[in-house]
A protein has these predicted regions:
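C-terminal accessory segment of soluble enzyme catalytic cores
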Residues: 195-202
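Hot-dog-fold acyl-thioester-processing enzymes
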Residues: 1-63, 116-194
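HotDog/MaoC-like acyl-thioester-processing domains
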Residues: 11, 65-152, 202-208, 214-234
């Protein structure tokens, strides 16, 4: 699991308030995991837009881990949550984004995500100098690893088809990270201790996806290849 570095007291940090809407909650009115993932994407986009940096690169999520604060109230319908985000570290061709969810001045959950920049052709590239100009101080020269591990799918895993929908795909032509979290939300419901989603390969339009699962783990499998893996603790 990723390390959750504390909120930086130097360099750039960005905060924005969001209202939890009807499409973000389950039948109990609690924030769904995919709703939380969308907020993480939104505040990352809003932060990057606010910097004013002009770039043709597109950042995609490689891995996201959410940790939920014991004893805190779970966000629910119409709550106003404040998301504070900053760069927690960098690697050669990736960066870590840390984000805190605060509800009424109380921390409810934390997230750490590895993002990878892609050029207009869709290929990974090194982190640009313009990125370090903005986020270098908050990263504090902390190096983060881009390596990800993969546990094999056990033979006794439960398997079910996960049909892809037109609405699952984003401007890159891949299944969006938040759509993947929708599948996770079908099998894992809050509250829980922590959950981590790792993208080993992108899910494409022609893929026929099988969800394999055991307690504590989920795999998105295409033709015997794991493209996304999930770990969680309730």
């Amino acid at each position: 699991m990723l390390e959750f570095v504390p909120l930086t007291d130097q360099g750039r940090r960005f905060a924005e308030q969001y209202i939890i809407r009807l499409g973000d909650v389950d039948m109990r009115g609690l924030l769904r995991l995919d709703g939380a993932a969308r907020f993480l994407q939104d505040v990352a986009t809003d932060d990057w837009s606010d910097t004013g940096v002009i770039s043709d690169d597109t950042w995609v999520v490689r891995r996201t881990t959410m940790r939920f604060i014991e004893g805190a109230r779970w966000p629910r319908y119409l709550d106003r949550v404040t998301l504070t985000t900053w760069c927690g570290g960098v690697g050669a061709a990736w960066a870590e984004r840390r984000t805190n969810f605060d509800l009424g001045g109380e921390r409810s959950l934390e997230a750490a995500a590895i993002w990878v920049p892609l050029n207009p052709s869709g290929h990974p590239v090194r982190v640009r100098e313009s990125f370090f100009d903005v986020y270098g101080e908050s990263a504090r020269a902390r190096k983060v690893s881009g390596r990800v591990s993969l546990t094999p799918v056990p033979d006794d895993a439960t398997r079910a088809a996960w049909p892809l929908r037109h609405a699952d795909f984003d401007i890159l032509g891949h299944v969006n990270n938040a759509a993947v979290w929708q599948a996770v939300a079908e099998l894992v419901t809050p509250p829980l201790e922590w959950v981590s989603v790792t993208h080993h390969q992108s899910l494409e339009r022609e893929d026929e996806v099988t969800l394999a699962s055991v307690p504590g783990a989920i795999w998105f499998v295409v033709d015997g290849v794991v493209k996304v893996s999930v770990e969680y603790v309730l």
